[in-house]
Amino acid sequence: MMSQPAKVLLLYAHPESQDSVANRVLLKPAMQLSNVTVHDLYAHYPDFFIDIAHEQALLREHDVIVFQHPLYTYSCPALLKEWLDRVLSRGFASGPGGNQLAGKYWRSVITTGEPESAYRYDALNRYPMTDVLRPFELTAAMCRMHWMSPIIIYWARRQSEQELASHAKAYGEWLANPVLAGGR
């Protein structure tokens, strides 16, 4: 008997989604999978008033949490930062009694406006992407979640249609069975 694929909550945070070809292409396979819930934070919370109880309920219902967003000033868009600060609260995700996310999986899916070569100690951004994403990795650890290797689409605007299609195909295959497919 085959087990069901893990339930994935894909938290999508892009304030200008209509202008992001790469993110729209990446979302297409996710929207076709029955085990994936795509949750567009900017569509749900244009006023930034986050329904914390609703968001925490969504987190409880899923096994894998994917954070898909562009890299903004070496971090995430403002609404996702607000979401992280408000939803992953002490007593829910961390601290005494805060074990609701323990054992779940965290994966960041990031698009950037610069090439991979810009993320080195001797390059434009002065740090490799592993250092830039360290706050997210630490947040996952604080929540007792398993950190999975991030998916990074560098220089997203300069990716060809064929390259984006290839990324989307691989992403969709991973989303279909994320825990067995790995990514750590």
Curated annotation (Swiss-Prot):
InterPro entries on file: Flavodoxin_fold, Flavoprotein-like_sf, K_H_efflux_KefG, KefG/KefF
Catalytic activity, EC: 1.6.5.2
Catalytically driven reaction(s): a quinone + NADH + H(+) = a quinol + NAD(+); a quinone + NADPH + H(+) = a quinol + NADP(+)
UniProt keywords, alphabetically: Cell inner membrane, Cell membrane, Membrane, NAD, Oxidoreductase
Annotated compartments: Cell inner membrane
GO cellular component: plasma membrane
Membrane topology: Peripheral membrane protein
Gene Ontology terms, MF aspect: electron transfer activity; FMN binding; NADH:ubiquinone reductase (non-electrogenic) activity; NADPH dehydrogenase (quinone) activity
Any single biological process term in GO: potassium ion transport
Chief location bin: membrane
Subunit structure: Interacts with KefB.
Similarity annotation: Belongs to the NAD(P)H dehydrogenase (quinone) family. KefG subfamily.
Function, as annotated: Regulatory subunit of a potassium efflux system that confers protection against electrophiles. Required for full activity of KefB.
Protein name: Glutathione-regulated potassium-efflux system ancillary protein KefG
Organism: Citrobacter koseri (strain ATCC BAA-895 / CDC 4225-83 / SGSC4696)
